[in-house]
Regions:
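Short helix-to-coil transition segments within interhelical loops
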Residues: 87-95
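Extracellular/periplasmic helix-loop junction at the C-terminal end of a transmembrane helix
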Residues: 178-197
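Short helix-terminus and kink motifs of transmembrane alpha helices
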Residues: 74, 78-82
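A short amphipathic helical element positioned immediately N-terminal to and/or at the very start
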Residues: 2-14
């Protein structure tokens, strides 16, 4: 039953226009970082270039996370509007459909994050004459993107309206960067900063001081993801989706 639901979701993903557009947006947005890199850095030693490019990993992960949440929320609201969710519920139990959507949102979020990483590294390679790729940070960025996809799915299920869901999904993550400008300690309690910190990113690159945090980013991140999944899951199981 679960396998059939996953296969049906995978077949629908082959023509996922929403994913295509968000992946393109992540790639283009990440390549824009090249405009902020001074041309003189291309002639700097390799060690200097590597040190200066390290903070960009957190920035790229931030871009990817926000857009991953946007993708997952919009993907759900579009499918609900077009009757795809109602059709799937005629074939599978609600919990099976919810599970397949959850896995699909996490995978889609990771794909969006990967596109952002690719665009960013290409931009840095062109602007700085080549920089090493930290494969550990790549895996962490994909995990952050997957987590953000789950967050976006929860927002989409609860809110349902297209525009409102897009706003809630993006601002509930991106607002952490704005809060960090005025109250760095409070920013550690936001989902985005907790995710970045939990997966080892240098949060100082997005304006947050590690000294301001309590060191409990992992339970905070897990708590936020569980809250999003529980809220979305309960709503999905009880609400009419037609």
């Amino acid at each position: 039953m679960i396998v059939r639901a996953l296969r049906a979701h995978a077949r629908g993903a082959t023509g996922d226009i929403v994913l295509l557009w968000v992946v393109a947006a992540a790639f283009v947005l990440s390549t824009s970082m090249a405009t902020s890199v001074p041309a003189e850095l291309a002639e700097a030693p390799a060690g200097v270039r590597a040190a200066l490019s390290a903070p960009f990993s957190a920035v790229l992960a931030t871009y990817g996370a926000v857009l991953a949440a946007v993708y997952a929320s919009f993907r759900y609201t579009v499918d609900r509007r077009d009757g795809v969710i109602a059709q799937r519920l005629m074939l599978h139990p609600r919990w099976v459909t919810l599970l397949s959507r959850t896995l699909g949102s996490a995978l889609g979020g990771a794909v969006v994050a990967l596109a952002g990483l690719a665009g960013g590294h290409i931009a840095l390679a062109v602007a700085m004459g080549g920089v090493p790729v930290g494969w550990a940070s790549v895996g962490s960025a994909l995990a952050v993107g997957a987590g953000a996809g789950l967050w976006g799915l929860g927002a989409g299920i609860v809110v349902q309206n297209h525009l409102v869901a897009l706003f809630v999904a993006s601002m509930s993550l991106g607002s952490a960067v704005l809060v960090a400008m005025f109250w760095s300690a409070a920013a550690h309690g936001f989902p985005l900063i907790a995710l970045l910190d939990a997966f080892g990113f240098d949060v100082t690159a997005v304006g947050v001081s590690p000294a301001d945090g309590s060191g409990g980013s992992v339970p905070v991140a897990v708590g936020w993801m569980l809250a999003a999944l529980v809220a979305g899951g309960v709503t999905f199981m009880k609400r009419d989706v037609t």
